Amino acid sequence: MPADEQIERLMNEYGDAILRMCYLYLKDYQLAEDAAQETFIKAMNAYDKFDHKSSEKTWITRIAINCSKNIIRTQWFRNSRNNYEDYMQSETHNPVEACLEKNSVTSAIMKLNTNDRKLIILYYYQELAIKEIALIIGRSENTTIQRLNRARRKLKEILVEVGYGER
């Protein structure tokens, strides 16, 4: 299959999930779109090197996480985060972002540290198996289970604080 058809298939199959994961990682819709686009460009350029040791979804998710991390590392991102907080306080921000920010669960996930947030996103939003998550984060399955359980407990604490209570 030619590279352009391959990338189109990847975008159709994983595009929405990758964009959602990048948004949850970056907390900014425009940056998430940039990260998702960069993910598919990198996937297209590296597809012939993909050795199929893991699933395609695991591979492209790893690329998306790395693209998101690269954006986070930039000084521009750090500066724009301060501006973003001010922007979110205004009445003219993106309605998609506003909807996601108002969602209590999404907001609670955003309050988790990066590692815990990554685990929750990969497990619940990307619907990856523990084995696939372990490959992505470079840990054993048992360690991944322990970390996921710890992230769940932290998320539960945050949700209880905002009024969800014991359920």
Could you describe each region identified by the protein language model?
Residues 19, 40, 113, 117, ...:
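C-terminal flanking helix
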Residues 70, 78-110, 129:
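Internal acidic/polar
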Residues 1-20, 33:
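A short, charge-rich alpha-helical start-of-domain segment used by transcription regulators
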Residues 65, 137-161:
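DNA-recognition helix of helix-turn-helix
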Residues 6, 17, 104-107, 117-118:
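Pre-recognition alpha-helix immediately N-terminal to the DNA-recognition helix
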Residues 119-123:
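A short pre-motif secondary-structure segment
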Residues 18, 22, 32-43, 63, ...:
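Short, small-hydrophobic-rich alpha-helical interface motif
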